Amino acid sequence: MRLGKMCGLLMKAFLAVLMLFVTAAAMEMEVYDEDDLAYAIDEKCENIILKGEYIPLDFLDQVVIDFDTVLNLNGNKLFSYFQITNGAQVTIKNGGFTAAGDPIIEVCGSDDEERPTVLILENLKIEASRGIQINNDGYTRVEVNNTEMQALSYHGWCLQISNAVEGNAGVDILVDGGDLFSAQGYVIECNGDAEVSIKNAKLGGAAGILMQAGSLTMENTALVTENNSTNPSIPTNTIAFTPATNAARVILTLGPGNQISSKSGAIFHIVPAAQGGVTAQIAITGGTFIAENGHPLFSALEGIEKVVEISGGSFPGISPEESAALAPCLSESITIDEDGNVAAKPQEPGVIVIHPNEENQTQSNPGTGAPINAIGQWLWSIVCWMHSQVR
């Protein structure tokens, strides 16, 4: 009996150790060729590390990833295209990524608010016909960090939000750093509702941003467009604001630190007639906007006051006609000076207006240039009034 019990205990211990090895194998796998990578995906490995310098995953269809994993390219190059779906949380990082497929990555949403589909791209160099397509069909979060991406095909884009325009089911997208370039189309197409944030990045190519639905905020980013193609169907606008008829909202916020310029056409192409009952707004709170080679800031001026609101920024070289057209778009206390800068309106003598800066520090009196001490000015005005009453 004792011998039997001992054998049983040894067998259990052996199986436990074996399970540890199996679990460890399932958690991480080094891949050297296409077969290794296909096996790692089939086994749903939590960490996949590329060791081969170039691995062409030559499948006819998208490779579907519906499990949590980190794909570490480890400085190597992968040829493939993926679909991330069903609440999977996927990170792809540290290497080159290319494909002739269209798009290179498709992200499909999750039905579970507590378990969104997540795609994180870090330190990648991507070349593809088209880049990342995010479907507004469920809860989704996408982050693109310090990634260089080139979309090379006709009407190719680096990021596209597609599907529903009526409402945001929980689609959040962040681009932080990196360089996104589209050779023959818009860099970013917001065709479906989402919350998009772009900061500290560089965007460029034939055209910039297409806004048809959702909300996009951009700050500390360079957006430079130039289209040298003779094909008239390739867009040239740096920012095209054409709200979809059924969109719940179309809101573009251009904040401080942006450098936005166009060499081939107008910076803004706005179609306010397409709004209908849509909440549509372009809020310019800072940044510099330069239309080069004689191009206008706006492709057309009619109706822009219905969409554009300006509280900061600089527009060097703006024409008198455009400056006049922007007057209804300006906040009440500001104007555009002769150099194209947004500035406080000149005040009548003796009138004190306090304009807080971005750090909420008090700035100078726009009428005299003298520093403003809000409490001191208030007390002094009371003293002056009392003195006048005594007299």
Task: Please state what every model-predicted region is.
Residues 1-4, 391:
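N-terminal hydrophobic targeting signals that begin at the initiator methionine
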Residues 6-26, 377, 381, 385:
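Sec-dependent N-terminal signal peptides of Gram-positive bacterial secreted proteins and lipoproteins
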Residues 349-391:
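C-terminal cell-surface addressing/anchoring modules of secreted/extracellular proteins
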Residues 32-37, 45-69, 73-80, 97, ...:
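N-terminal extracellular ligand-recognition/capping segment immediately after the signal peptide
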Residues 26-50, 342-344, 351-354:
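N-terminal capping/linker segments that flank leucine-rich repeat
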Residues 64-70, 83-153, 158-185, 189-264, ...:
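Surface-exposed loop/turn motifs in large extracellular/passenger domains
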Residues 21-30, 369-371:
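Sec-dependent signal peptide cleavage junction
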